[in-house]
């Protein structure tokens, strides 16, 4: 269920401060964050944000299409290795 419009989008303040500082300085280095729950704002467009997936930081280049989505949507946490192959099908 989506968040109530009355409440507005959520973003961690520490991430917002880092993004504002990077935009102000025109800094293009990746911004490390563990905040997968934060919503992507229009200010983020063009920045690279390294989102933690539980094991490492995955670099995410933010585009205009990503605005309104959560950061965690673009850093998958599970690795799919495929189903076990049938031994009879290999022959």
Swiss-Prot record:
Residues spanning the signal sequence: none
A Pfam family recorded for this sequence: Ribosomal_S19
PANTHER family attached to this UniProt entry: RIBOSOMAL PROTEIN S19P FAMILY MEMBER (PTHR11880), SMALL RIBOSOMAL SUBUNIT PROTEIN US19M (PTHR11880:SF8)
GO molecular function: rRNA binding; structural constituent of ribosome
Biological-process GO terms, alphabetical: ribosomal small subunit assembly; translation
Domain of life the protein comes from: Bacteria
Protein name as it appears in the record: Small ribosomal subunit protein uS19
Known function: Protein S19 forms a complex with S13 that binds strongly to the 16S ribosomal RNA.
NCBIfam families on file: rpsS_bact
Annotated family: Belongs to the universal ribosomal protein uS19 family.
Disulfide partners: none
HAMAP family per the UniProt record, alphabetical: Ribosomal_uS19
């Amino acid at each position: 269920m989506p968040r109530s419009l009355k409440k507005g989008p959520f973003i961690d303040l520490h991430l917002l401060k880092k993004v504002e500082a990077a935009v102000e300085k025109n800094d293009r280095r990746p911004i490390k964050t563990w905040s997968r729950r934060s919503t992507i704002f229009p200010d983020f467009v063009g920045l690279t944000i390294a989102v933690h997936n539980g094991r490492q930081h995955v670099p995410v280049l933010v585009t205009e299409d990503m605005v309104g989505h959560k950061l965690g949507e673009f850093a998958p946490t599970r690795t799919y290795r495929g189903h076990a192959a049938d031994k009879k099908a290999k022959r």
